[in-house]
């Protein structure tokens, strides 16, 4: 079935969707949990953390595992461990080819990531081939996003589309966009934004996703990989 609305822009999440940083998050968090005799992190917990701003995710981990540390201490540990591994992250299957294809077709593309600027640079400085293709990049610590308004709120997508419209002097509407996501909070935020959602969960997450059809509610598609995207279905 062909998508009923012409797609005029594509907006992307980053972690676990374009690059394999979700696996690095799991590795480093398990190292932190092991220090306190806790863990390992299981997908029923991780699925609720995906796409959340760092402080909110950290708060939930501390509460769930009853860690005897403050949020600042937790963050300090994780940042130190993660910074050693970001340089090893790589594009997930189909991601780089999709970005190149959309650029070739002159489809405006925005990156809207919950990662802050520091983490974004650490994760992507060796992957310029793909990230230099974006027309605009919005990070989770952008001051224009009010505190407490990260995913599942739609603000980051609204800001990404606003920047695309300003750059190209267009008036693209949310329902003329596709949002690409891997996490449940991100899917909820994309739906609240009003876009069609391409949901590509981590392969190990499928057992804990719940009722995916109810979550998408006819406003999206679940794929096992970005390689499975049928461009013709969306007029791309």
From Swiss-Prot:
Protein's UniProt keywords contain Signal: no
Single GO molecular function: pseudouridine 5'-phosphatase activity
Gene3D superfamilies per UniProt: HAD superfamily/HAD-like, Putative phosphatase, domain 2
Entry keyword Transcription: no
Signal peptide: none
Keyword terms: Hydrolase
Pfam families: HAD_2
Record InterPro entries: Gpp1/Gpp2-like, HAD-like_sf, HAD-SF_hydro_IA, HAD_2, HAD_sf, PGP-like_dom2
Xref: SUPFAM superfamilies: HAD-like
UniProt xrefs under CDD domains: HAD_AtGPP-like
Enzyme class: hydrolase
Enzyme Commission code(s) on record: 3.1.3.96
Reaction equations catalysed: XMP + H2O = xanthosine + phosphate; psi-UMP + H2O = pseudouridine + phosphate
Highest taxon, organism lineage: Eukaryota
PANTHER family from the UniProt entry: 2-DEOXYGLUCOSE-6-PHOSPHATE PHOSPHATASE 2, PSEUDOURIDINE-5'-PHOSPHATASE
Family: Belongs to the HAD-like hydrolase superfamily.
Annotated function: Nucleotidase with XMP as the best in vitro substrate. Low catalytic efficiencies of YKL033W-A observed with XMP and other substrates suggest that these could be secondary activities for this protein, and its primary substrate is not yet identified. May possess pseudouridine 5'-phosphatase activity and together with dTTP/UTP pyrophosphatase YOR111W might constitute a pathway for the detoxification of pseudouridine 5'-triphosphate (Psi-UTP) and -monophosphate (Psi-UMP).
Protein known as: Probable pseudouridine-5'-phosphatase YKL033W-A
Organism: Saccharomyces cerevisiae (strain ATCC 204508 / S288c) (Baker's yeast)
């Amino acid at each position: 079935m062909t998508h009923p609305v012409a797609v005029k822009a594509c907006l992307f999440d980053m972690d676990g969707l374009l690059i394999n940083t979700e696996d690095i998050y799991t590795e480093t968090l398990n190292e932190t949990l092991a220090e306190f005799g806790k863990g390992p992190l299981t997908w029923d917990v991780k699925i609720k953390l995906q796409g959340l701003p760092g402080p909110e995710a950290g708060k939930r981990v501390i509460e769930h595992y009853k860690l005897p540390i403050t949020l600042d201490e937790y963050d300090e540990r994780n940042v130190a461990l993660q910074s050693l591994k970001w340089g090893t992250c790589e594009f997930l299957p189909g991601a780089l080819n999709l970005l190149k294809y959309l650029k070739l077709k002159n489809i405006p593309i925005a990156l809207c990531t919950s990662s802050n600027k520091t983490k974004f640079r650490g994760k992507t400085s060796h992957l310029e081939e793909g990230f230099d293709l974006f027309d605009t990049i919005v990070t989770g610590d952008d001051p224009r996003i009010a505190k407490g308004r990260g995913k599942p709120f739609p603000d980051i997508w609204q800001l990404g589309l606003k920047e695309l419209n300003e750059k190209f002097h267009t008036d693209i509407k949310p329902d003329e966009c596709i949002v690409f996501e891997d996490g449940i909070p991100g899917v909820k935020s994309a739906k609240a934004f009003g876009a069609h959602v391409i949901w590509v969960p981590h392969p190990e997450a499928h057992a804990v996703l719940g009722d995916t059809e109810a979550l998408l509610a006819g406003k999206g598609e679940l794929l096992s990989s970005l390689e499975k995207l049928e461009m013709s279905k969306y007029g791309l």
